[in-house]
Regions:
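Short, low-complexity disordered leader/linker segments with a strong preference
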Residues: 1-42, 348
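Extracytoplasmic ligand-binding site segments that recognize negatively charged/polar headgroups
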Residues: 46-54, 89-229
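Short beta-strand->loop
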Residues: 111-118, 133-134, 162, 249-261, ...
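A ligand-binding cleft/hinge motif common to bilobed small-molecule-binding domains
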Residues: 100-104, 226, 231-250
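A bilobed periplasmic-binding-protein/Venus flytrap-type ligand-binding module shared by bacterial periplasmic
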Residues: 144-149, 263-275, 286, 294
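Early extracytoplasmic/lumenal segment of secretory-pathway proteins
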Residues: 35-104
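Periplasmic-binding protein-like
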Residues: 139, 168-176, 203-208, 214-215, 249-271, 286-309
Length: 348
């Protein structure tokens, strides 16, 4: 009889221990950290015009439910900011600005590789082979003119880089600072690629004597010409188109007929982005037909990289412009060296 009771007691004890251990296991599972929720907010550094930036942010939020906090900066400023924040990124995406700067950022380990499925339809020459950045638009480099100045002085518009060196244009030219504005750097790189480094720097030194001001932002020279502050602004033609659309009837456009360069505006994810999944969604969305067509309805008139997207009619006037074989990879790889050489050339 005692043996039976001992067996029963042992069974109860074992059962209690089993329940106890099961309970402990259950408590451990309950304490496991919950899966990280996908962010519903993202910070984006934008290099497009303010109006376009606002609409891009608004439309992305409508389509995905993710709010965009954006900071508008020039390409050079954005690159400097991302460098400064390398160990503690404050933004997840870089949207807009010349690919030259993106290539430099990739070289410095500042970008995250991501091959969006929507990038498959975009031409290889418009994207990084490793997925670090993808092109979203093209802008042709040219001259934005104050027509009143040319009429008053009975002058012909410049149609070559050499025309800018004429005496009548001394102190009448504005361009972006190559160090802060990616547009300004494209001018430097384009001249060097067209003329060779030695002759190119000689030309830029001569051009420097004609320049009234180097602006912080690359689009500012167009506004200077529209306001009559300078006869010529060196920048992208779409900046001039925007001013004409805004009612600046004095603005005229021309470009170097021997061949001009173009920017390839890009989008990329910043290394160690604080909102990685939202960043991938933004890149996917930025490459769509809808996203790329937003600009032409909001003061941006660039050519587009998505073959399904319709380019703005206003830009088609320049679709047959002669382009140089602008090497973005070389330009990005040599950015620091060329800027140093340019600084030296203009100070001599």
């Amino acid at each position: 009889m005692k043996s039976i009771w001992k067996k029963a007691a042992l069974a109860v004890l074992v059962g209690a221990m089993a329940v106890s251990f099961t309970g402990c296991g259950g408590e451990k599972k309950a304490e496991a950290p919950a899966a990280k929720k996908e962010s519903k907010e993202i910070t984006v550094y934008m290099g497009v015009v303010e109006q376009s930036a606002k609409v891009v942010a608004s439309e992305f939020e409508k389509d995905t439910g993710i709010k965009v906090n954006f900071v508008r900066m020039s390409g050079g400023e954005t690159l400097s900011r991302i460098r400064a924040e390398k160990n503690n990124p404050q933004a997840s995406v870089w949207y807009g600005g010349s690919a030259d700067s993106f290539i430099m950022a990739k070289k410095e380990g500042l970008l995250e590789a991501y091959k969006s499925p929507n990038a498959e339809k975009i031409k290889p020459e418009f994207k990084d082979a490793d997925g670090y950045w993808t092109g979203i638009y093209q802008g042709y480099l040219g001259f934005i003119l104050d027509g009143r100045y040319f009429d008053e002085h009975k002058l012909q518009p410049p149609t070559s880089w050499d025309d800018l060196l004429k005496p009548e244009f001394t102190g009448q030219i504005v361009m972006g600072n190559p160090g802060s504005a990616s547009t300004g750097y494209v001018v430097v790189s384009a001249i060097v690629q067209s003329m060779g480094e030695e002759k190119g720097m000689e030309y830029l030194a001569k051009l420097n004597k004609q320049v009234k001001q180097y602006t912080k932002a690359g689009a500012a020279p167009a506004r200077s010409a529209a306001l009559g502050e300078a006869a010529i602004g060196i920048t992208y033609l779409h900046n001039g188109i925007r001013l004409i659309k805004e009612g600046n009837t004095n603005v005229r456009l021309s470009l170097p007929e021997e061949g001009t360069a173009y920017e390839l505006g890009a989008v990329a994810i910043i290394k160690n982005a604080p909102d990685m999944e939202a960043a991938k969604k933004f890149v996917d969305w930025a490459l769509t037909k809808k996203a790329q067509e937003i600009g032409q309805h909001n003061n941006s008139y660039q050519f587009l990289t998505n073959p399904e997207a319709n380019p703005p009619e206003e830009a088609m006037k320049f679709k047959d412009a002669k382009l140089i074989d602008y090497n973005f990879q070389w330009s990005g790889d040599n950015r620091a060296r060329l800027l140093e050489a340019w600084n030296k050339a203009v100070k001599e």
